[in-house]
């Protein structure tokens, strides 16, 4: 049986070593996020100020996996 996860949106506030980021969720929680394997393999660059989708386990709500980088409205990428 697959583990149930919550999916939230948030803003990257700080970049940490080894692909870790501090993420402020839309509900104002501050959690630690790490980059998923697909994003790492695709060389998608994540910088502070980016909006992301993050998958949070029900058992440990202080850590999450970044699964998608949302497009910024003002950037040209």
Swiss-Prot record:
Sections of the chain in a coiled coil: none
Residue span(s) of domain S1-like: 1-71
Gene3D superfamilies per record: Nucleic acid-binding proteins
GO terms of molecular function: ribosome binding; rRNA binding; translation initiation factor activity
An annotated GO cellular component: chloroplast
Main location as per UniProt: plastid
Localization terms from the record: Plastid, Chloroplast
Keywords: Chloroplast, Initiation factor, Plastid, Protein biosynthesis, RNA-binding, rRNA-binding
Pfam families in the record: eIF-1a
PANTHER family xrefs: TRANSLATION INITIATION FACTOR IF-1, CHLOROPLASTIC
Function: One of the essential components for the initiation of protein synthesis. Stabilizes the binding of IF-2 and IF-3 on the 30S subunit to which N-formylmethionyl-tRNA(fMet) subsequently binds. Helps modulate mRNA selection, yielding the 30S pre-initiation complex (PIC). Upon addition of the 50S ribosomal subunit IF-1, IF-2 and IF-3 are released leaving the mature 70S translation initiation complex.
Family, per entry: Belongs to the IF-1 family.
Assembly and interaction partners: Component of the 30S ribosomal translation pre-initiation complex which assembles on the 30S ribosome in the order IF-2 and IF-3, IF-1 and N-formylmethionyl-tRNA(fMet); mRNA recruitment can occur at any time during PIC assembly.
Protein name per the record: Translation initiation factor IF-1, chloroplastic
Organism phylogeny: Eukaryota, Viridiplantae, Streptophyta, Embryophyta, Tracheophyta
Gene: infA
